[in-house]
C-alpha cells in the first residue's frame, strides 16, 4: 500500500521497515535531492535515542558544477542532526561509454566500500514508489519478464553490505510535502528534466497515463505482484537444482532427463543460474543465445553460453568454464582467481595463478584419473612460476596445493533464493 500521509505516519512506516531486526549501524545514502534528504531526516526521527547509529554518505560524481554545494548541504544538515557525514568522490569518468551505467556502478561501489570501512552493515537508499513505477515502465520497453517487471527489490546484498529501500511504499509527493511542511531545504538535479534520459521519458509517460488510472501506486503494486511471482519461480528453480544437479570441482553436473521435463521457464532460470554461477557475468546472456543453448540441451548437443561450455552428451550434462574466457587471466599468488577460486599452498617465487591450458595439462600425468574432461581441466586454475607449472590441484597435480571455491559449493543453491 502506498502512503501519502503526514510526518508521524512516515516515521512510523519507516520504523516498521526495521522493526524485525534493526541494524546497530545504518548508513544513509543522501545525494541532496528531496527523496534522500527526507529519508535522512525521517530516519533521525525514527531512532532519536541512538538505538540505531546513523551514518550519512554523499557520492559526488563530479559531473556537475553544483555537486560540491549539494554535498555541502547534506553535510550541514547531517551535522545539525548530530550525524557523521562523509563525501565520497568519484573521479573515474573518462568521457567514454555509458555515463549513467558507469556512474551507478561507481556509486554503489563507493557506498559499499564506505560501509565496510565504517562497520556499517546496512545502507538505506531513497528510491520511492515513483522510481519503482518508472523502472517498471522502462523494463516494459525492453520486453522484460517476471524478474525484470519485479523492478527494484526492497532488500538485496551487494559486496557484503545489505542495501535496503524503505521508501518503496512512499510517493515522491509525500516526501516533498514533508520537507515543505518542516521547512527543510533540498537540491533539484537539473538532469531530472533532461528528456534524453529514459527515466525522464518514463516519468513523463507516467503522467500521461494518469487519466487511465495508471499511476505510481498501480505500477508499484504490479511490481510487488511480480516480485511475489518471482519468489515462487525462484523456489521451484531451487527445488529443481537440488533434485537435478551436483557440483564437481566447480563444474555443475545436470541430470538431462529430469531437465527436459521441466517447464520452460524453470529450465531457463536454472540454465541462467548455472551459467551465471560459473561464468560470473555481470549481465545475463542475450535472449537469443539462451534460447539456442536451451534447444541444444534438449537435443543433447554441446554449446557455449556466458563464458561456459555446456557438454550435452552422456548421462550427465556438464557445465564448465570456457577456456577462451580465462585464457589470459593471470593474478598473483594469494589473489582470487576468476572471481571464485582460492588456491592455497607453499609460497612460490614469482608465483602466478593462471588457467591450466593444453600445454599445462600435458604436464599432469594423472589428469584422467580425476574423471573430469579435457575441456573442463584446461580452464581450471593452476599455479605457475614463470614458464614452470607448480600445481594444478583439479587436474591431479597437487604438490601441496588446494583449490577451493571462495563461497563454497552450497552457495550455488543458496544464491537461488537470495536477491
Curated annotation (Swiss-Prot):
Organism of derivation: Ruegeria pomeroyi (strain ATCC 700808 / DSM 15171 / DSS-3) (Silicibacter pomeroyi)
SUPFAM superfamilies xrefs: Adenine nucleotide alpha hydrolases-like (SSF52402)
Keyword Transmembrane included in the entry's annotation: no
GO annotation, cellular component aspect: cytoplasm
Domain of life the protein comes from: Bacteria
Free-text function comment from the UniProt entry: Ligates lysine onto the cytidine present at position 34 of the AUA codon-specific tRNA(Ile) that contains the anticodon CAU, in an ATP-dependent manner. Cytidine is converted to lysidine, thus changing the amino acid specificity of the tRNA from methionine to isoleucine.
EC number: 6.3.4.19
Family statement: Belongs to the tRNA(Ile)-lysidine synthase family.
EC top class named in words: ligase
Compartments, as annotated in UniProt: Cytoplasm
Molecular function, one GO term: tRNA(Ile)-lysidine synthase activity
The protein's name in its UniProt record: tRNA(Ile)-lysidine synthase
Assigned keywords, A-Z: ATP-binding, Cytoplasm, Ligase, Nucleotide-binding, tRNA processing
Keyword hit for tRNA processing: yes
